[in-house]
Amino acid sequence: MTLLTGNGMPTRQPLVRMSEQLRQIPLNFDDVIIHSRLRDFDKSVGDSGLSIKLGHIGTERYFFRNRQVSLQRGEYLLVNRHQTFDCFIRNPTPVEGFCFYLSPRLIQEAASGLSRNTEDLLDHPAPKSNKAPRFLEKIYRTDENELGRYLEQLRPALAAHQQLDFNQVFFDVATALLRTHWRTEQEMRGIDCARRSTREELYRRLCTARQYIYDNYCNDLQLEELAKAALLSKYHLLRTYKQAFGITPYQQVLELRLHKATRLVGEGDSLSSVARELGFSDRRSFTKAFKKKFGMAPSHYRAG
């Protein structure tokens, strides 16, 4: 898509640095990445393009889906085509972000490529409909899915405006978006709820609970605390978390603790300090959980 640079000249560059000129143009591009740098900015968007907004420096604020959301580094916001939202930034120093705009043609090409990959379809069954997918709109952590991890890999090169094969970059972003979308759809289908809108809102809250676990799994995490973060009752949280993710919150905490334990034990930390750091009641309970998970005591794991 043709854009106007700061001097008013047209450009077809796939990565464009923009600031105040964003006030004057509609934000419904196709297959372009906008690197924004703004201090005092507000804009109402009445018809957006399909976009992935990646936080970089500072905080961007949006009024979207009848609520205010904040976007920071380590997060991205997914917005479907033809949506409305408001964006506002007030900061003494520039706030920077990257926005990936993807065309319907690109999404279709990526979906066609995935449909020819039998192995990938076994892991991420594609829907049979030819309709453009409606992606789940929310703030995602970049460490929670394939798309986020790929965006984080791209960030340094984008920030430095390095020369990249942008045709491949756009195709890879679209492919990761679709695989992440299909995984999300699988998880949402597990939730026992008739209405799609209710299921989506429940899934958003469950993702909040899961991220709370990721941020606090080394602490003495209580179910009441987790339910409060997700705005759900304890029993509703327990039931729907297992339906969506195939694991209970307690099992999720234990998995994360033991995964980190393998690294700490391998680095030579004492078993008592590992148990203490990861929130186990004592060395004995840590050793028992480790052996049950990996089939050997942590001391043998270290020796191996």
Spans of features found by a protein language model:
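A short, N-terminal "cap"/entry segment at the start of jelly-roll beta-barrel domains
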Residues: M1-N28, A157
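N-terminal regulatory/effector-sensing and dimerization cores
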Residues: S19-P127, L158-L164
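Short, Lys/Arg-enriched, Trp-marked, Pro/Gly-tolerant hinge/linker segments that flank
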Residues: D123-N145, E152-N219, E224-E225, A229-A230, ...
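Residue-level signal for well-ordered alpha-helical positions
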Residues: R90, G113-L114, T180, L264, ...
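ATP/adenylate-binding site constellation spanning eukaryotic-like Ser/Thr protein kinases
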Residues: I57, E255-L258, G295
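Terminal helix-turn-helix DNA-binding modules in bacterial transcription factors
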Residues: C207-D215, D220-L232, R239-D282, T287, ...
